């Protein structure tokens, strides 16, 4: 452990003389004897740096450096010894005067020939104190004068020097026992690092207050000294050691403050600043700049989060079909302005995109489509093929045509460039070029990266493309047309693309669950009407049923089937 030593050296140099204020014998006057006295005290402490530097922050009065605690004047605490008084005392002018010295401070002017028989010699006391403190970081020197005036009839010099040294280890006993009796007559320069010492027998009475105060400060236990040495090695700024609240208490109290309390304190501070501040033009301009920066930051955050989450958001569009000339030819009473169909596009994952269709004419029902761009397959679930619990009992599988939609990035770009209302000028034709073929559910599940929840436990059909037209051999089959989604150009020579329906993939399928329902033609003619209306099988953008009506509770259908000639359907 490194022990630091503080040496407090006090030097007092007293020059005492008595001279008359004037007279012819001024040049023959001999001053009396001079006594020099020095006091020295040693104290050893490991935490001397903190004790000596605490006064710089707390503003305490250091009794070891304050001259008012040690003496009140130049004569305080000194024993003035004089040689045996002569028979006669002379003033400067040579006149004899046997009167005693007057130290009352009365100053009188002497002139030749004046009657000074009853006059006393005036002695003016004058002195100064020099305080020097040298540390590793620097030092300070303070000179304080006191007395009633300049030295005139008497001279007195008092020199107090306090030197603080901090050796790396304790001085040896032999070095500490060395004594020096040389007199010091010079004042040390501020820039030079020189210590002037006079070592005599220490006077415990004059430094009793200082020693007791330092003893009180050094009465800590071993743990406190170790902690102080650690803090001193970190070179913290000087702090007072006399405070009742330690640094550890402040640190622990700061850690206990919660985040909510810190926010509340910060809010209260800002509110107090706004309530008590003076609203000058400069302050208002600063507040406006801060507000603009906050708005800009919010706008940038909105753009960033929109770019991140928009890919997995749900987009809704209205699809207007082209004018159906064939439908108008078959049914002249049909209104030419068809109602639009709505579609919800949901980017389910980085590999799948889902389409939720609320179909109107020429669509015969609502449907769900899942496109897996990783495996290259498409799953269809017609909402008319559901049971009383809303579960699909039939799903369809077909390969993805890359010429229609190449990737999910292309689809995302088309969705971002599409307007809310999409007017189609071509497409939407019915193509009966597919034949359904039953496959195992396990085989169908292997065709997709993520499992299709709507087709869980359903019967799968693979739609194989053929070259023949609609098969008329099945008299009890229903016609199904599913949308073939594609990315198309908005105009012929424009680069912007949009979402569209390239065609309708149609086929005929026998549904055994509908064998007990009566067959009716739809409003367009040429197709059988599904037992479950499309108004009862709509779903929202989250995939939840809207106005769901189970098949068993559907009104307007009877349990008996009515035979209809197949020729009337052609």
Curated annotation (Swiss-Prot):
Residues 369-461 form the BRICHOS domain. It is a single-pass membrane protein. Keywords: Disulfide bond, Membrane, Transmembrane, Transmembrane helix. Residues 93-116, 218-248 are annotated as: Disordered. It comes from Caenorhabditis elegans. One of its GO terms (cellular component) is membrane. The keyword Transmembrane helix applies. The keyword Protein biosynthesis does not apply. Residues 310-570 are extracellular. Disulfide bonds join 395-455. The chain crosses the membrane at residues 289-309. It is found in: Membrane. This is BRICHOS domain-containing protein C09F5.1.
């Amino acid at each position: 452990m490194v022990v630091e030593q503080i040496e407090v050296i006090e030097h007092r140099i007293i020059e005492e003389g008595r001279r008359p204020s004037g007279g012819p014998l001024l040049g023959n006057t001999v001053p009396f004897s001079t006594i020099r006295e020095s006091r020295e005290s040693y104290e050893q402490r490991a935490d001397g740096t903190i004790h000596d530097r605490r006064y710089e922050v707390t503003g305490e009065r250091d009794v070891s450096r304050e001259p008012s605690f040690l003496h009140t004047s130049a004569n305080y605490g000194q024993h003035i010894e004089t040689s045996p008084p002569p028979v006669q005392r002379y003033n400067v002018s040579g006149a004899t005067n046997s009167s005693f010295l007057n130290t009352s401070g009365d100053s009188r002017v002497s002139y030749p020939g004046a009657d000074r028989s009853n006059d006393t010699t005036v002695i003016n006391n004058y002195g100064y104190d020099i305080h020097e403190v040298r540390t590793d970081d620097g030092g300070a020197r303070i000179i304080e004068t006191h007395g009633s005036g300049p030295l005139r009839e008497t001279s007195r010099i008092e020199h107090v020097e306090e030197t603080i040294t901090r050796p790396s280890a304790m001085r040896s006993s032999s070095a500490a026992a060395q004594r020096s009796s040389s007199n010091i007559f010079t004042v040390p320069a501020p820039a030079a690092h020189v210590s002037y010492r006079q070592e005599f027998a220490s006077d415990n009475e004059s430094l009793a207050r200082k020693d007791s105060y330092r003893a009180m400060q050094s009465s800590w236990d071993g743990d406190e000294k170790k902690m102080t040495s650690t803090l001193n090695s970190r070179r913290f700024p000087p702090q007072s050691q006399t405070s009742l609240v330690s640094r550890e208490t402040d640190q622990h109290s700061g850690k206990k403050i919660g985040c909510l309390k810190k926010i509340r304190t910060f809010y209260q501070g800002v509110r107090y600043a706004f309530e008590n501040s003076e609203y000058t033009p400069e302050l208002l301009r600063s507040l406006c700049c801060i507000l603009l920066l906050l708005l800009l930051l919010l706008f940038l955050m909105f753009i960033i989060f929109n770019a991140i989450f928009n890919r997995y958001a749900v987009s809704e569009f209205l699809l207007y079909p082209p004018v159906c000339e064939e439908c108008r030819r078959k049914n002249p009473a049909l209104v030419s302005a068809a109602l639009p169909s709505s579609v919800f596009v949901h980017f389910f994952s980085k590999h799948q995109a889902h389409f939720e269709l609320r179909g109107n004419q020429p669509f015969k029902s609502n449907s769900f489509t899942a496109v897996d761009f990783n495996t290259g397959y498409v799953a269809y679930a017609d909402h008319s093929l559901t049971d009383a619990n809303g579960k699909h009992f039939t799903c369809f599988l077909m390969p993805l045509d890359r010429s229609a939609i190449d990737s999910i990035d292309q689809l995302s770009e088309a969705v971002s460039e599409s307007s809310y209302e999409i007017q189609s000028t071509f497409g939407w034709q019915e193509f009966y070029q597919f034949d359904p073929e039953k496959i195992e559910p396990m085989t169908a599940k292997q065709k997709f990266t993520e499992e299709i929840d709507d087709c869980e436990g359903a019967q799968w059909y693979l739609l194989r493309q053929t070259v023949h037209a609609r098969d008329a051999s099945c008299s009890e089959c229903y016609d199904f047309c599913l949308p073939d989604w594609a990315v198309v150009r908005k105009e012929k020579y424009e680069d912007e693309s949009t979402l569209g329906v390239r065609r309708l993939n149609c086929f005929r399928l026998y549904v055994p669950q509908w064998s007990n329902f009566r067959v009716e033609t739809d409003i367009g003619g040429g197709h059988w009407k599904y037992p479950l209306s499309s108004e009862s099988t709509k779903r929202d953008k989250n995939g939840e049923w809207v106005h769901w009506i189970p098949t068993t509770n559907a009104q307007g259908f009877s349990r008996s089937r009515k035979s209809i000639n197949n020729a009337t359907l052609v």
